């Protein structure tokens, strides 16, 4: 459905750097492979993310066609960037602003490290039965390998959680991971994110600030997709309460 903000259309769906033309906002334009030809369109985010809208991709594409005269799309609650990605693929002529408040881009930039870590864990687990609980020496070997990864840089604990923890459980750091049970759910293939953010202009701002900045521009469509009521927001880098829902709706 639609709503109005300073008389601008809203759509509610509940590595080279440059400056964008809006002086108040610094953006990072990822256009190593600008969309000059037909490129892959992802139907789900390349890395796990709580609340990505992969089940609504086909409907979202249909709704985008109603805004074929608009020139700027601002994804206020960018999340995994899936809506921004699809918008840019469907509308390569338009400017698409992806508000990466959860720093999903950092996870994508470290995808090779994540793949290497998971490959090493697959070697440790060997032919151990799938979905079985991991205990004893094997569990300690897992923890030792993950600790080693921490000493050399970034560890994507959210992605790691989907390979080791019971469904719906997530750890955000080593301490939390050590306190949870492990299961052999390790992904059997590498993750890929080729071209996922191509053409997007990536920012990291409070959604209110972004709405105020772009609300004065003509031809702007805001993609407003906040966390669902009742969703576990512990994996998000923002505090979200009932009052925030009311603020968005009003």
Q: Each PLM stretch: what is its role?
A:
Residues 203-242:
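Active-site segment flanking the S-adenosylmethionine/decSAM binding pocket
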Residues 89-93:
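Conserved hydrolase catalytic core segment
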Residues 74-87, 98-102, 163-165, 216-232:
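Conserved proline-anchored active-site loop of SAM-dependent methyltransferases
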Residues 26-68, 82:
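S-adenosyl-L-methionine
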Residues 248-250:
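C-terminal substrate-binding/active-site "lid" region of AdoMet-derived donor-dependent transferases
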Residues 7, 21-22:
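Cysteine-centered motifs
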Residues 95-197:
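Class I S-adenosyl-L-methionine-dependent methyltransferase module
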